[in-house]
């Protein structure tokens, strides 16, 4: 049966009150949803996002998928059906058979179907128990208002080009903007429990493919491979590394993931361990923000740090729990109990340049609330030339497309000879296999360390007179310049990416184990930062120096072991551009 014709003028009248007068409407069209009778949709593409206004039996309801939650779109054609199944667009599908689509240039397309299908990919926020998570949503628009496929495809391509321009913030054109730069992705297969390959395959590559972002993927082959790689390659050939001119991105595959957790916290992006959807979207979008970097100096090395410098209790846990790496982040909890039982003390001198006024810092952020898209559960189908649907054989074609599970990628990740990146990666993306001829041999690197010069005296020279000195026995000293230093370690609640502040925590000997336990429990919520006792002190500083006595102990920089002995650090604001989630 044919569905009744819709009066477009009356539809405009009903729905006009739902559209924000400040939003600019770029495109709009009327669609029918095939799985539901008497349901008409007015779909608008605005400066805010994709608006779906549903009109059913006189009632009206509007929902919007925000532009910041849309990663990309693609035009498709229906696939040629198997012999005997019938190729007429009006023929019935058997059971709940789903529409099969192929690329518009495929040789396996159905030439009898004049429809053009636009798939719009989004990852929207959904409540999940006590937190939020992103859920993949696909909106399918079927264009068949014209008698020829070429005309329908032209209309679909216009929507696709407009979506792409809005996503990247460029003026609207008739053709999608071309991404002529690639991402450089360095993957550490040994990070954390060793599941980086699987996480990239399942969580990152699909988002980059849907966003049509080309990339080069290099799997690290030995310790410091990434450092050697960027020292000896021209990194300006890539649009980002996953440096003030070449932005840096982080995708958490390890155990700590402090920087990734910090980004999600500061930019209202839900963080779910081993679910990198939000940060993958950020990588595809390429929005950036400046980040401070800390210059760290030891007796034999100069390095640049983005997360922490540690001495004592937490550093002991970080390094000594490596033997439990296979269990992931839980290793920190297990080893914390062990170190609490066998509590150690370290004698030395801690000196620092205190920042006196931090009153202008923002208050700690509140937990994330749901303020993103709410998508329409259903796929949409445009009317034909007479604005009628005269058969219902496709009633189940898109029934599951909005909230259906993404098909598991089964491409061969481990192919010895493959240089393609697999996982339906965008055309031109490359995977550089760990089985290359150079994988077993580490070539010498002849490059120097570049970075800002120090403003401090040399490591063994006297410090300025205004510095504060703390001498005695310490349980731990830990400095951080990020909000989180681990998935559940809210170390510095007031910290920002580019505030020029190092938060220096000192816990002196004499504190009881119960007080340390209470302190550790408070770290998960950040309440420890308000404690100021004779044994616990947290100070905002611009630089510090630690001079431990003896030779037995552990010092770490960003969770990595460094030589034990004098160490000093100073912060340099806005040194790195970091890829961050989109807040627009």
Residue ranges of predicted features:
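ATP/NTP phosphate-donor binding region
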Residues: 2-243
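Eukaryotic intrinsically disordered and solvent-exposed regulatory patches
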Residues: 28-30, 35-39, 57-59, 102-107, ...
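Conserved beta-strand elements of beta-rich interaction domains across eukaryotes
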Residues: 38, 48-51, 57-58, 72, ...
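Structural signal for hydrophobic/aromatic residues that build the beta-strand cores
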Residues: 43, 50, 70, 159, ...
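Eukaryotic short linear interaction motifs
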Residues: 51-53, 59-61, 80-82, 127-130, ...
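Generic C-terminus detector
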Residues: 148, 153, 157-161, 541-542, ...
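Catalytic core of DAGKc-family lipid kinases
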Residues: 220-222, 228, 235-239, 245-482
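Catalytic phosphate-donor-binding core of small-molecule kinases
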Residues: 286, 336-352, 441-444, 453-455, ...
């Amino acid at each position: 049966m044919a569905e009744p014709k819709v009066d477009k003028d009356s539809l405009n009248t009903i729905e006009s009150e739902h559209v924000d007068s400040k939003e600019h409407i770029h495109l709009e069209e009327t669609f029918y949803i095939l799985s539901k009778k008497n349901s008409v949709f007015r779909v608008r593409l605005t400066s805010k996002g994709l608006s779906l206004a549903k009109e059913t039996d006189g009632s009206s309801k509007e929902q919007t998928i925000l532009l910041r939650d849309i990663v990309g779109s693609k035009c498709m054609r229906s696939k040629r059906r198997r012999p005997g199944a019938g190729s007429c667009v009006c023929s019935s599908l058997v059971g709940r058979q789903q529409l099969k689509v192929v690329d518009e240039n495929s040789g396996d397309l159905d030439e009898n179907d004049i429809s053009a299908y636009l798939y719009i990919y989004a990852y929207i926020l959904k409540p999940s128990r006590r937190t939020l998570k992103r859920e993949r949503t696909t909106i399918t628009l079927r264009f068949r208002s014209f008698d020829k496929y070429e005309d329908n495809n032209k209309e679909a391509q216009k929507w696709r080009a407009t979506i792409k321009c809005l996503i990247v913030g460029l003026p609207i054109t008739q053709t999608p903007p071309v991404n002529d730069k690639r991402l450089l992705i360095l993957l550490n297969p040994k990070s954390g429990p060793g599941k980086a390959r699987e996480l990239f395959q399942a969580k990152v590559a699909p988002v980059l493919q849907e966003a049509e972002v080309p990339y080069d993927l290099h799997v690290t082959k030995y310790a410091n491979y990434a450092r050697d790689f960027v020292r000896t390659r021209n990194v300006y050939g890539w649009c980002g590394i996953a440096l003030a001119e070449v932005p840096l991105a982080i995708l958490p595959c390890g155990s700590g993931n402090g920087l990734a957790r910090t980004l999600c916290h500061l930019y209202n992006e839900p963080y779910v361990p081993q679910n990198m959807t939000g940060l993958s979207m950020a990588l595809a979008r390429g929005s950036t923000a400046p980040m401070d970097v800390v210059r760290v100096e030891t007796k034999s090395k100069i390095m640049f740090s983005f997360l922490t410098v540690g001495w004592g209790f937490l550093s002991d846990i970080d390094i000594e729990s490596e033997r439990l790496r296979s269990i992931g982040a839980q290793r920190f909890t297990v080893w914390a109990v062990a170190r609490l039982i066998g509590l150690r003390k370290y004698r030395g001198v801690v000196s620092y340049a205190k920042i006196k006024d931090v009153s202008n810092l923002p208050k700690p952020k509140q937990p994330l609330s749901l303020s993103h898209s709410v998508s329409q559960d259903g796929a949409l189908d445009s009317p034909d030339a007479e604005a009628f649907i005269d058969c219902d054989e496709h009633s189940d074609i898109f029934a599951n497309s909005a909230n259906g599970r993404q098909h598991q990628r089964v491409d061969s990740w481990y192919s010895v000879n493959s240089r393609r990146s697999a996982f339906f990666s965008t055309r031109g993306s490359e995977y550089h296999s760990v089985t290359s001829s150079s994988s077993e041999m580490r070539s010498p690197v002849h490059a120097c360390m570049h970075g800002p010069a120090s403003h401090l005296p040399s490591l063994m020279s006297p410090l300025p007179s205004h510095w504060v000195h703390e001498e005695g026995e310490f349980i731990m000293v830990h400095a951080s310049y990020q909000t989180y230093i681990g998935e559940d370690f809210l170390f510095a609640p007031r910290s920002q990416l580019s505030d020029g502040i190092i938060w220096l925590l000192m816990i002196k000997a004499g504190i009881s184990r119960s007080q340390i336990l209470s302190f550790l429990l408070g770290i998960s919520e950040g309440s420890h930062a308000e404690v100021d006792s004779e044994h616990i002190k947290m100070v905002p500083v611009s630089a510090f120096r630690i001079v431990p006595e003896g030779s037995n102990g552990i010092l770490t920089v960003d969770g990595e072991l460094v030589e034990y002995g004098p160490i000093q650090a100073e912060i340099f604001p806005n040194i790195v551009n970091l890829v961050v989630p989109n807040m627009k």
